[in-house]
């Protein structure tokens, strides 16, 4: 039995459905992420798990017990917010100890647990400091410690890294992974940042307009998206209109509108005549000078429309003969690289037969 079972949960606000008949199972010890754009329902769902809001229908079961109607303070759940929510008039130690004091724990136990958590979050000598004396990353660590001090069954994290700068956010991701491994408590993490979800999670639920589009491991979410929304939301894709010409267990043969035929990975349920798009990620696309004609079967000529230099790689936007645009990444440390391609340069783009994915759902 899963630790957390969300069964057909719906939440409406007037005529607007924020969460629409959602069902999710979360296993004990799992780092599970709710990922989606603003307004997709992820925070509303988190609030219902915490008890700050109630579903209009459905069940939320924790260890098999229905949580609907149980107030937040009575649930074995704690929430860490993006704003830290630290008490400014309390020291770090008192902030961490607050949930234990409210629970009536003995002073000796409180001191022991607080010191243990300060060690775990790498702030052993910060107990007597006040929040205004801490950096953003230190405040976030204190918030994590306070969330863990009463040993909840679930720790809910509502975009906790959103207020941090990029470098600190990356450092905190590593700390969060290590902390979850050490403690073994189930984390449910809410974010709109795809890179965070991919880096942190055991599994991800991608949400859109109140629905769950796909639940899977990060690698499968990225490489085998279930539909166009998931493919487009997770990372970058280029799409080309395509029709299935051949569908066999080993591969699909697709006719790309206005260009020619390519080979793509097989997908269950596809039939000859199905129309959709071939979605391909920039890192799967090779770009070369036309004189170095690709040995790959999937290749077309094009012209550089634009490019974006971002330090370690350059992203090239190539216009194909049918007017479609496809992005390609080229490492700036590529062996033998003499110069960048320039706008209007003629190029060849190519990709392996096992790259890309055919999607035939509406965008």
From Swiss-Prot:
Q: Which residues form the ABC transporter domain?
A: 4-234
| Major site of localization recorded for this protein | membrane
Is Transmembrane set as a keyword in this record?
no
Q: Can you tell me which residues bind ATP? A: 36-43
Q: Tell me, how does this one assemble? A: The complex is composed of two ATP-binding proteins (PotA), two transmembrane proteins (PotB and PotC) and a solute-binding protein (PotD).
What does UniProt list as this organism's lineage? Bacteria, Pseudomonadati, Pseudomonadota, Betaproteobacteria, Nitrosomonadales
| Organism name | Nitrosospira multiformis (strain ATCC 25196 / NCIMB 11849 / C 71)
User: How does the entry describe its membrane topology?
Assistant: Peripheral membrane protein
> Where does this protein reside within or beyond the cell?
Cell inner membrane
Q: Which family does it belong to?
A: Belongs to the ABC transporter superfamily. Spermidine/putrescine importer (TC 3.A.1.11.1) family.
Q: Which GO terms describe its cellular component?
A: ATP-binding cassette (ABC) transporter complex
Assigned keywords, A-Z = ATP-binding, Cell inner membrane, Cell membrane, Membrane, Nucleotide-binding, Translocase, Transport
Q: Which SUPFAM superfamilies match?
A: MOP-like, P-loop containing nucleoside triphosphate hydrolases
| Listed name of the protein | Spermidine/putrescine import ATP-binding protein PotA
Top enzyme category = translocase
**Annotated function:** Part of the ABC transporter complex PotABCD involved in spermidine/putrescine import. Responsible for energy coupling to the transport system.
Enumerate the catalysed reactions: ATP + H2O + polyamine-[polyamine-binding protein]Side 1 = ADP + phosphate + polyamineSide 2 + [polyamine-binding protein]Side 1
InterPro entries from the entry?
AAA+_ATPase, ABC_SmlMolc_Importer, ABC_transporter-like_ATP-bd, ABC_transporter-like_CS, Mo/tungstate-bd_C_term_dom, P-loop_NTPase, PotA-like, Transp-assoc_OB_typ2
């Amino acid at each position: 039995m899963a630790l957390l079972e969300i069964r057909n949960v719906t939440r409406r606000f007037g005529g607007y459905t924020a969460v629409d008949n959602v069902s999710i199972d979360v296993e004990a010890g799992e780092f599970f992420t709710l990922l989606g754009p603003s307004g997709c329902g992820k925070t509303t769902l988190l609030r219902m798990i915490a008890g700050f809001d109630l579903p209009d229908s459905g069940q939320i079961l924790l260890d098999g017990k229905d949580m609907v109607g149980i107030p937040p303070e009575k649930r074995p759940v704690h929430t860490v917010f993006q704003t830290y929510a630290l008490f400014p008039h309390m020291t770090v130690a008192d902030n961490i100890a607050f949930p234990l004091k409210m629970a009536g724990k003995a002073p000796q136990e409180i001191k022991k647990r607080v010191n243990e958590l300060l060690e775990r979050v790498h702030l052993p000598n910060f107990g007597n400091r006040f929040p205004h004396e801490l950096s953003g990353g230190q405040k976030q660590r204190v918030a994590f410690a306070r969330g863990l001090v009463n040993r909840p069954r679930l720790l809910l994290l509502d975009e906790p890294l959103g207020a941090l700068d990029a470098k600190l956010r990356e450092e905190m991701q590593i700390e969060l992974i290590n902390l979850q491994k050490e403690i073994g408590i189930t984390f449910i993490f809410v974010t709109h940042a795809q890179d965070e979800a991919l880096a942190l999670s055991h599994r991800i639920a991608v949400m859109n307009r109140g629905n769950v589009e796909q639940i899977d491991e990060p690698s499968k979410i990225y490489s085998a998206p279930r539909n166009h929304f998931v493919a487009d939301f997770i990372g970058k894709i280029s799409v080309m209109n395509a029709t299935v010409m051949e569908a066999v267990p080993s591969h699909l043969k697709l006719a790309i509108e206005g260009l020619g035929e390519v080979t793509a990975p097989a997908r269950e349920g596809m039939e000859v005549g199905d129309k959709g798009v071939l979605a391909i990620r920039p890192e799967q696309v090779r770009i070369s000078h036309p004189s170095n004609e690709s040995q790959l079967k999937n290749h077309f000529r094009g012209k550089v429309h634009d490019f974006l230099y971002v330090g370690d790689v350059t992203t090239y936007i190539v216009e194909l003969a049918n007017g479609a645009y496809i992005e390609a990444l080229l490492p700036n440390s590529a062996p033998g690289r003499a110069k960048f391609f320039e706008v209007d340069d003629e190029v060849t783009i190519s990709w392996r037969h096992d790259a890309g994915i055919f999607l035939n759902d509406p965008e």
